[in-house]
């Protein structure tokens, strides 16, 4: 029975050694992954300022577009109001002309 226990112990020691090597490999690969992730994060942080700059740029463009649209709307509204006034003046004068023609 001592031979079987020694065989068992040898197999157990070999398996423990394989497990140890595998764990070391996993730890090594996790370290590499950690470095890669840290590098990616640092590169991403470098673009934060550039991203904010572009965001401000597009916000400014949108504000300009909104102002231009409001100005055009205001001009169109004023133009429509002026057209209405001038058309009523035209109608008023034509009514007066009709009244004068009828008197004559």
UniProtKB/Swiss-Prot annotation:
Ranges where the record places region Disordered: 65-104
GO terms for cellular component: cytoplasm; DASH complex; mitotic spindle; mitotic spindle pole body; spindle microtubule
Record-level Gene Ontology MF annotations: microtubule plus-end binding
Disulfide bonds: none
Residues spanning the membrane: none
Matching InterPro entries: DASH_Dad1 (IPR013958)
Subcellular location as annotated: Nucleus; Cytoplasm, Cytoskeleton, Spindle; Chromosome, Centromere, Kinetochore
UniProt keyword Heme present: no
Compositionally biased tracts (Acidic residues): 95-104
Domain of life of the organism encoding this protein: Eukaryota
Compositional bias annotation for Basic and acidic residues: 65-78
BP GO annotations: attachment of spindle microtubules to kinetochore; cell division; mitotic sister chromatid biorientation; protein transport along microtubule to mitotic spindle pole body
Cross-referenced Pfam families: DASH_Dad1
Keywords linked to the UniProt accession: Cell cycle, Cell division, Centromere, Chromosome, Chromosome partition, Cytoplasm, Cytoskeleton, Kinetochore, Microtubule, Mitosis, Nucleus
Keyword Cell cycle among record annotations: yes
Protein role: Component of the DASH complex that connects microtubules with kinetochores and couples microtubule depolymerisation to chromosome movement; it is involved in retrieving kinetochores to the spindle poles before their re-orientation on the spindle in early mitosis and allows microtubule depolymerization to pull chromosomes apart and resist detachment during anaphase.
Family label: Belongs to the DASH complex DAD1 family.
Description of how the protein assembles with itself and partners: Component of the DASH complex consisting of ASK1, DAD1, DAD2, DAD3, DAD4, DAM1, DUO1, HSK3, SPC19 and SPC34, with a stoichiometry of one copy of each subunit per complex. Multiple DASH complexes oligomerize to form a ring that encircles spindle microtubules and organizes the rod-like NDC80 complexes of the outer kinetochore. DASH complex oligomerization strengthens microtubule attachments. On cytoplasmic microtubules, DASH complexes appear to form patches instead of rings.
Name of protein: DASH complex subunit DAD1
Annotated source species: Debaryomyces hansenii (strain ATCC 36239 / CBS 767 / BCRC 21394 / JCM 1990 / NBRC 0083 / IGC 2968) (Yeast)
């Amino acid at each position: 029975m001592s031979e079987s226990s020694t065989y068992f112990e040898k197999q157990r020691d070999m398996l423990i050694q394989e497990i140890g090597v595998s764990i070391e490999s996993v730890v090594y690969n996790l370290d590499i992954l950690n470095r890669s992730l840290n590098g990616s994060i640092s590169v991403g942080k470098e673009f934060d300022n550039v991203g904010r700059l572009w965001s401000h740029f597009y916000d400014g463009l949108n504000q300009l577009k909104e102002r231009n649209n409001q100005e055009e709307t205001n001009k169109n509204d004023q133009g429509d109001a002026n057209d209405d006034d001038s058309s009523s003046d035209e109608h008023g004068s034509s009514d007066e002309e009709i009244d004068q023609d009828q008197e004559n």
